């Protein structure tokens, strides 16, 4: 009977390979090395099983060694939420399976498709040890570097990436709340609008688009767009040049890029013919859609910002000689948008775009074992429309 390569079922992509070679053992060898066994001649299958058992015992010793190393690295487990969990290695609980390479690859591909959790569970290669922890927790305890030093170098790459990942889902929500509270305190920002709400908010100011297209309204965003065009040697904006742009100059601050792009698409749908017929080299270089999203949309949102935050021109904005010494409302709004880009990226862009998405958001927060009332975007809204 030929022996197939045996593989051990483990956590992660890679499985342990146990290649059984030269498994023919005679009675004398068996009795001398293992007196407890019967004097009956062992078959090839029995020999294979016996070799696997030896490897399991070695694996158990290695597991205990790694376990002690990690416990020493942590120094203190009591009083923290860190847990070291070890699967039992006892009679009948070690599973061995025979698989082909193609089956192993399928398992590996399926493992890669699984989303990362807020609490990472790492399977150390060649062991049955699992280390459960949150990276945010490790940093506060000053143990992040210690655990990395104890992780085997041959650890599966995907699992290693989960260890050094700076923010997990849970950590991000904590960071998001900090940013939201900080910017709301400093700037007293209005609530983050849903898709339909922001479209309704821009409708009264759509005439500004006509003024911009006719060049009757000065635009800081247009000036930045023109400068990008002048710095280019290409006839149109390439993907490489777009990635190299400092998009913070073209983002409408606390509204976030997702909502800004929705506004840009709305503008393009209404004024498509006018935008496509523009003779401006800057507009042609950007292209109609990007020009709508990164030049016209933020200018339109400046007008919405003025209304939401109650901004007004300074009394001395214009003097008798028509030379302003104060600041205009649009200038104030532009400054606020530039100062709140981080809020837009971290908070607005990750807040629900539709009312019904709030339920999904809160379910995710609950799964992460965080306070729903504290971390939900619902808390920061004045009046939440009915979720249908």
UniProtKB/Swiss-Prot annotation:
Residues 22-58 are annotated as: Disordered. Signal peptide: none annotated. InterPro entries: RTC4, RTC4_C. It is found in: Cytoplasm; Nucleus. It holds the Pfam family RTC4. May be involved in a process influencing telomere capping. PANTHER family: RESTRICTION OF TELOMERE CAPPING PROTEIN 4. Belongs to the RTC4 family. This is Restriction of telomere capping protein 4. It comes from Vanderwaltozyma polyspora (strain ATCC 22028 / DSM 70294 / BCRC 21397 / CBS 2163 / NBRC 10782 / NRRL Y-8283 / UCD 57-17) (Kluyveromyces polysporus). The gene is RTC4.
């Amino acid at each position: 009977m030929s022996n197939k390569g045996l593989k051990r079922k483990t956590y992660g992509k890679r499985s342990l390979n146990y290649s059984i070679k030269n498994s023919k053992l005679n009675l004398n060898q068996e009795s001398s090395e293992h007196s407890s066994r019967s004097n009956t001649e062992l078959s090839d299958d029995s020999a294979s099983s016996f070799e696997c058992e030896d490897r399991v015992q070695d694996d158990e010793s290695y597991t205990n060694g790694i376990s002690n190393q990690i416990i020493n690295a942590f120094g203190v487990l009591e009083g923290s939420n860190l847990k070291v969990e070890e699967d039992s290695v006892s009679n009948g609980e070690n599973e061995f399976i025979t698989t082909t390479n193609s089956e192993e690859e399928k398992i590996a591909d399926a493992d890669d498709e699984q989303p990362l959790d807020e609490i990472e569970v790492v399977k150390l290669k060649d062991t049955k040890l699992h280390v459960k922890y949150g990276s945010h927790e490790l940093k506060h305890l000053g143990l992040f570097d210690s655990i990395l030093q104890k992780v085997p170098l041959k650890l599966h790459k995907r699992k290693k990436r989960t260890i050094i990942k700076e923010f997990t889902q849970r950590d991000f929500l904590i960071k998001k709340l900090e940013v939201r509270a900080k910017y709301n305190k400093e700037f007293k920002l209005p609530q983050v609008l849903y898709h339909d709400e922001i479209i309704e908010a821009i409708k009264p100011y759509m005439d500004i688009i006509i003024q911009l297209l006719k060049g009757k309204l000065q635009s800081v965003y247009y000036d930045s767009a023109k400068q990008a065009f002048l710095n280019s040697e290409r006839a149109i904006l390439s993907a490489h040049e777009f990635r190299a742009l400092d998009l913070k100059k073209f983002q409408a601050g606390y509204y976030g890029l997702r909502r800004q792009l929705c506004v840009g698409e709305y503008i393009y749908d209404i004024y498509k013919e006018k935008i496509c017929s523009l003779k401006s080299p800057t507009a042609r270089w950007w292209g109609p859609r990007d020009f709508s999203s990164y030049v016209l949309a933020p200018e339109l949102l400046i007008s919405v910002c003025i209304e939401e935050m109650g901004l007004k021109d300074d009394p001395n904005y214009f003097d008798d000689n028509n030379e302003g010494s104060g600041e205009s409302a649009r200038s104030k709004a532009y400054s606020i948008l530039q100062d709140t880009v981080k809020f837009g990226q971290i908070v607005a862009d990750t807040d629900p775009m539709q009312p019904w998405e709030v339920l999904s958001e809160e379910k995710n927060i609950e799964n992460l074992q965080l306070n729903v009332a504290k971390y939900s975007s619902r808390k920061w809204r004045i009046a939440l429309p009915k979720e249908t």
